[in-house]
Amino acid sequence: MERREEQLGAAGAGAAPALDFTVENVEKALHQLYYDPNIDNKNLAQKWLMQAQVSPQAWHFSWQLLQPDKVPEIQYFGASALHIKISRYWSDIPTDQYESLKAQLFTQITRFASGSKIVLTRLCVALASLALSMMPDAWPCAVADMVRLFQAEDSPVDSQGRCLALLELLTVLPEEFQTSRLPQYRKGLVRTSLAVECGTVFPLLEQLLQQPSSPSCVRQKVLKCFSSWVQLEVPLQDCEALIQAAFAALQDSELFDSSVEAIVNAISQPDAQRYVNTLLKLIPLVLGLQEQLRQAVQNGDMETSHGICRIAVALGENHSRALLDQVEHWQSFLALVNMIMFCTGIPGHYPVNETTSSLTLTFWYTLQDDILSFEAEKQAVYQQVYRPVYFQLVDVLLHKAQFPSDEEYGFWSSDEKEQFRIYRVDISDTLMYVYEMLGAELLSNLYDKLGRLLTSSEEPYSWQHTEALLYGFQSIAETIDVNYSDVVPGLIGLIPRISISNVQLADTVMFTIGALSEWLADHPVMINSVLPLVLHALGNPELSVSSVSTLKKICRECKYDLPPYAANIVAVSQDVLMKQIHKTSQCMWLMQALGFLLSALQVEEILKNLHSLISPYIQQLEKLAEEIPNPSNKLAIVHILGLLSNLFTTLDVSHHEDDHEGPELRKLPVPQGPNPVVVVLQQVFQLIQKVLSKWLNDAQVVEAVCAIFEKSVKTLLDDFAPMVPQLCEMLGRMYSTVPQASALDLTRQLVHIFAHEPAHFPPIEALFLLVTSVTLSLFQQGPRDHPDIVDSFMQLLAQALKRKPDLFLCERLDVKAVFQCAVLALKFPEAPTVKASCGFFTELLPRCGEIESVGKVVQEDGRMLLIAVLEAIGGQASRSLMDCFADILFALNKHCFSLLSMWIKEALQPPGFPSARLSPEQKDTFSQQILRERVNKRRVKEMVKEFTLLCRGLHGTDYTADY
């Protein structure tokens, strides 16, 4: 091996000095890794060992570490080092060393066949990697050779040991192929070669599996080996005998799990649907498992029922279309569907008593999609067969969605309750999907059941049953337009009759009412049937989320019909807010609900309600403004400001939100005079300034203040105009004292909405110049500590160029400094900041011709920008940002072509720039490609992606598969 070590001197260059990587030092480091209690020492040892594994010396010490006198941990490291050297540094191995390396690995595997299993596996993986690298040319019959060598009678190892070692090697070979870093063209060749080798492997596996004398450990290994090989997309018909043998092995409890895995992997191969005859032969085999399934369910054997269900679902889900097409076999497929239905409705509560039913849900989606994809005539036939099945499915799902008894539920862990919640969401999604198949009849079916349940005097009904039926309604109504359903009026009439004695039932009642809010908007006469229930529930903290979200939906959808109820809604809401019944987020939702509600009232009514609603908070804020800042009063201030901003988010008397709803919407006339929100903001403006003066250094408070105005601006649009001058002045003072990103975001909103209006341009221009000047000063002090400010600043600049380029005409704006700061921002590690900076340049470069100062700066400093872009593409920036940098290159090419053609050649001339991996020819090709493409932005993005892969040494590797 010394010879190989000399020849492979290049491998692992850059690791620690060669003398360090001796057998003795590796053993010491391993001892430190496994037994040293100090975590820092462990980490150091691990880092050193990783360097050792890739060093040239690994070829020497790895074989010595495999000596029989070493402990398994040390032997395992030696085997792993061999695998790493073979798989990652194959090109460093001289071709004349292949055979001796192969022979030594065979020798070691034979020796470890009766030794440590974990070491044996690593050695098998190393030999598998070697085989994949040599196939097909240097080792054309690799698998046949492996089988022949391990069947040799002259081996010192007993036949069972040899057999298990061979099976381990054959098992890891396809697994290593799946994870190997072979180039794409080699992968295709090796896959073809392995497919041919199936002819050697499968007969051997069949023989071992069917041989009565084969011990259980061998048969289990055979099943695992088969499971590994079928993932190479072996034709299903070639697997037929082994699949049948695996079905037979399901009766053996020791082989059950391995058999399930093998069968599921074989059935699930994408190519399997081509072999319909084989699939049809599998249906009776699956149906033959029904008695075993029933016995497992009866005995509470969750593992067995889970495994059999996986097999049935794998066949049904992967091949429903192919099997539906076999019309003459419709009864056997229907039997399979009914078997899966049994699995869906398996007795017990998920996830405590069973975990099987959740496996089946996607099958029902797939089957429905396949039925509905047939042409009309064929679809009608299948609808006739499968509509009753889907009605049965609805009953089964609603039964599975039922809560357990209160006593039983009380014993569930929080994790089990969360899993059950997610399971119910999955059932809800399935019901919503099934509606497409069953239509309005499904709602009628649910309504009839609920009606019978609530009106029957014969026997008391369980709340769980009622809740599940309502949950079914809610699932459908949340996403499907039920406005034309003739059962909803009856449902609304039934809801008040429900005896609510349980939180889960009350929650579902609330969510169901919320899901029907659009229907209530079309049938306002029914609002009074359910609104009292919602207002009553507001006072119950356990119903916080459901009651508040339902009230918000009703206020949003039905606001034009709520004025008669407004006083009551406001009074109840005020009461629960004052009593602090709800958590912060629900308080914010409640304020949004009240904003929707007030929007539909007359201005005088709005002002009156606003006064009574927010006066207590204004008084509290006045008191807090006098106090010395501390953490508790900060929370109170942020809470009050949040309530105000959420109220103003939805309080829209001009009904901008409704503009997209269509002409038929009932709108109130737009009121004349000042907007109520503006009136309130002007009244509290001084108070907000007072609060700010004490909290300017606190980003959270500043953010909360800015949020009030930002949300108001977004809602009010032009109605906000009277506030623009004083808000600009306040923002300027705020930002000059303590720069915060939220102030820049609000400035961006003002630029977006008001900068184009001559009356508002002067204060906005003054604010824009001020925040730009302050931010440029920040860059001089060191902007790396403020990526959020830089991000918001870049977005503001881009918005200014997009909305009002005149802002860049002012002589007081230092365009050169802005340009240089933006180039600096391109080098930030934070992706959002880089993205925002790229966005600025893509807005700036098209202005070269129309804004003189911009044209001048680009001419003087554009080369600096190009170099920054090339550095980023060369590897300095994340690959996910390459499209953004491509946009800059495209803009440079489109708007500064003559300059770019000169700069790009100069910039790419220095050797090693932007990457040492590039040849001069590759750089020249890239520059020519870019300069040629001035129309198709998508092509430029593709060029940049290709170039960055070359720069990073990733071109043609597996790393680029998803790129």
From Swiss-Prot:
Compartments in which it is found: Cytoplasm; Nucleus
Gene3D superfamilies reported in the protein's UniProt record: Leucine-rich Repeat Variant
Superkingdom of the source species: Eukaryota
Keywords: Cytoplasm, Nucleus, Protein transport, Repeat, Transport
HEAT repeat boundaries on the chain: 24-54, 56-88, 95-135, 142-179, 194-231, 236-268, 276-325, 330-372, 375-438, 440-476, 487-522, 524-558, 562-600, 603-648, 676-716, 720-754, 761-803, 815-845, 860-893, 897-931
InterPro entries associated with the record: ARM-like (IPR011989), ARM-type_fold (IPR016024), Exportin-1/Importin-b-like (IPR013598), Importin-beta_N (IPR001494), Importin_beta-like_NTR (IPR051345), Importin_rep_1 (IPR040709), Importin_rep_2 (IPR040944), Importin_rep_3 (IPR040520)
Major location category of this protein: cytoplasm
PANTHER family: IMPORTIN-13, TRANSPORTIN 3 AND IMPORTIN 13
Assembly notes: Interacts with UBC9, RAN, RBM8A, eIF-1A and PAX6.
Name assigned to this protein: Importin-13
Record organism: Mus musculus
Lineage: Eukaryota, Metazoa, Chordata, Craniata, Vertebrata
